[in-house]
């Protein structure tokens, strides 16, 4: 499956726009607290543990979105958008969305 942030796929023709697809992942308060507690492990100005948890949440959300697209019988998702939000006390949400298309 082709997944892209652009509205079109170079060299491909979009035959049909099917639906909006999305995926979400929420990191619980304890995970966020533990990650912040390990910020002392910052190397080169980056919080490795925190980045790892963000990547994990983003991957989960992307996989969920791709699975929904497969269920709709499409072979590509265009216009991908990734959003991060802090919800409630210490909970982080990663949400991805895009347009499921047939090429």
Curated annotation (Swiss-Prot):
The keyword Methyltransferase does not apply. Keywords: Plasmid. It comes from the Bacteria. The keyword Transmembrane helix does not apply. It holds the Pfam family YbjQ_1. Belongs to the UPF0145 family. HAMAP family: UPF0145. This is UPF0145 protein pXO2-45/BXB0052/GBAA_pXO2_0052. It comes from Bacillus anthracis. The lineage of its organism: Bacteria, Bacillati, Bacillota, Bacilli, Bacillales.
């Amino acid at each position: 499956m082709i997944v892209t942030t652009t509205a079109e796929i170079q060299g491909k023709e979009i035959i049909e726009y099917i639906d909006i697809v999305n995926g979400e992942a929420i990191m619980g308060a304890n995970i966020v607290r533990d990650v912040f507690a390990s910020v002392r492990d910052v190397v080169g100005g980056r919080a490795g543990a925190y980045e790892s948890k963000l990547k994990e949440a983003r991957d989960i959300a992307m996989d969920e979105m791709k699975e929904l697209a497969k269920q709709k019988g499409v072979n590509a998702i265009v216009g991908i958008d990734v959003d991060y939000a802090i919800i409630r006390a210490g909970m982080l949400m990663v949400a991805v969305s895009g347009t499921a298309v047939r090429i």
